[in-house]
Amino acid sequence: MNGKEVSSGSGRTQSNNNKKNNNGGSTGISHASGSPLTDGNGGNSNGNSRSRSRSRKSSGTTGGLLKKPPLLVNNEAVHASVPDASHTSCNNGTLEVSINNPEPHVVDAVARHLIRNPSNSLQLQGGDITRDLYKWTNDHPSSPSQYQYPSQPALSTSIPSQAPSFSNRKRSMSFSAASIASSSHLNNNSEANGNPLAAIGLAPAPMTHEEIRAPGGFRRSFIIQKRRKHNVDAPIPNFFTRNFIEFLTLYGHFAGEDLSEEEEEEEETEEEPEEEALETESTQLVSREHGRHPHKSSTVKAVLLLLKSFVGTGVLFLPKAFHNGGWGFSALCLLSCALISYGCFVSLITTKDKVGVDGYGDMGRILYGPKMKFAILSSIALSQIGFSAAYTVFTATNLQVFSENFFHLKPGSISLATYIFAQVLIFVPLSLTRNIAKLSGTALIADLFILLGLVYVYVYSIYYIAVNGVASDTMLMFNKADWSLFIGTAIFTFEGIGLLIPIQESMKHPKHFRPSLSAVMCIVAVIFISCGLLCYAAFGSDVKTVVLLNFPQDTSYTLTVQLLYALAILLSTPLQLFPAIRILENWTFPSNASGKYNPKVKWLKNYFRCAIVVLTSILAWVGANDLDKFVSLVGSFACIPLIYIYPPLLHYKASILSGTSRARLLLDLIVIVFGVAVMAYTSWQTIKMWSQ
């Protein structure tokens, strides 16, 4: 049908092919195939000529795209402009169509491209698509000063003669938040000017219907509605809040294991609308694996996270540990532990990169089988329970001394066991928290109190030495009787191995992890050695297991620090217990047992968590009378395997598979033998001294 025109006025049929269809199925009409539409005189209107290029991509028939602009005509206009004809004919390639008695298939084909109502362009085929495209083009010219088309695409037969030229725009412009900002600005102005909806307590519409019909408008409207629903302004989290939430999230992936659960996601969506308000129109529709954060940490932030993970309560046990080992042996042992620990930490990260998995236990499963994974996770759970029990005794001891001095109670009037089990009332509600980020407030307070306590320990120890001098008469360079107790306490102090993998994963530049870790280990070694040596030099053999008890108990400064430090450890204990609870919970309950939709399963898990808290308190009560020996046993039996046995074992197996040098393999074997020997000897010695 190419090259044919629709005309009228001839009154006769000149072709035998008047009933043939074109290839696309639009029968007998050349409008869909590319030839111009003319009026009764066979001429093409100037308006149609201009609009041809604009409408070429607008819509199409069944056989192809619509090549010509639609005709804005009605029935009266058709009958007025076309003479009477009773038949169709074809002469010299021209098809004549009768208006009074047209062929049915011709009427059907023409009707597809006629707009009965000029204000409704959706009657066109594909109009629901081209409408938004035209509108977006009209609303986004190459410059603001250029001509703006009407809000609806120009679908009439006349197009303005002077059309502005549009430069090619990047696709990112379609994600511009200008429409949202302008809509919010208009809504705010309308409210200020006495919006009738606001007057009756109804919020104005976040977006107009034209903005919603724009590409991506529905998603933008949905995001704004969620903001309005929860009345959230979506402020940018401040530095401390953002960093502490990220730090707490690392405990959800302790030792690289995924310890989060489905209930956590449910609580985030139902009880934390602030997270929803942080969504934008460019936020991905389907989130990544829960718990994984797309935002990477800088090197400085990684250093701060490492410092937080290593510097904790264990530093206050070091003065008594220096007395057990002797100041010379203790300083040398701490320095050696820092060096060997750094090598084992690097071996663990190297093995993770070689094996290609993130979990500490998963590395053991791939290299040695499921029994190795069970051993690793058992050590993690046991060490975290040991930390929590030691923290419980530490808190109970400080609270007992504080109460006796502040309330002038008789010493021993309230037993230490009472303070231990009273903490269960606080630990149980906190342990039931599924979303670990909700502990951000308690963790922030705890870290601030710990920092204040450390500053006070340094300041008062220096002041005490300046006034009374060094207690050199009672200081020992090497304590032959109790030196093995120091090793377990020193290992207990380096308690941050579980956070190494998630911190390394969160770094924007993972290649900077080694130098960052080396710098942190140097800083930590200086803090540990200086604190232990300084307090031991100040108090000598009279140093207490908790060094705060050596400070004058009749001053408000000491009482305040004791209370704040006790509260700090009290609030941070549930955070230490969280990985152990999740590991034991995963072993006890089936993988598909979720309390998200089953209240019975959820309450069974709640009872299980309460049982773990009570068990930890009982363990703390057992070791309360000899806290230094209890801490040493936890460090020897639970922490030494995690640092000095499992990492070289994993690295040895992975290095054999990758072809590492024999010298490096021999070094791994030496560290393994050293770790096993130290663990066995120190654990046996600690139990022996405890029994005596």
Swiss-Prot record:
The keyword Membrane applies. GO terms for molecular function: L-glutamine transmembrane transporter activity; L-isoleucine transmembrane transporter activity; L-tyrosine transmembrane transporter activity. Involved in amino acid efflux from the vacuole to the cytoplasm. Capable of transporting large neutral amino acids including tyrosine, glutamine, asparagine, isoleucine and leucine. It comes from the Eukaryota. Residues 258-279 have a biased composition (Acidic residues). It is a multi-pass membrane protein. Its main location: membrane. The modification Phosphoserine is found at residues 59, 119, 121, 165. Residues 15-24, 141-153 have a biased composition (Low complexity). Residues 1-71, 135-170, 258-294 are annotated as: Disordered. The lineage of its organism: Eukaryota, Fungi, Dikarya, Ascomycota, Saccharomycotina. InterPro entries: AA_transpt_TM. This is Vacuolar amino acid transporter 3. The chain crosses the membrane at residues 302-322, 329-349, 374-394, 412-432, 443-463, 483-503, 519-539, 561-581, 607-627, 630-650, 665-685. GO terms for biological process: amino acid transmembrane export from vacuole; amino acid transmembrane transport; proline transport. It comes from Saccharomyces cerevisiae (strain ATCC 204508 / S288c). The keyword Nucleotidyltransferase does not apply. Keywords: Amino-acid transport, Membrane, Phosphoprotein, Transmembrane, Transmembrane helix, Transport, Vacuole. It is found in: Vacuole membrane.
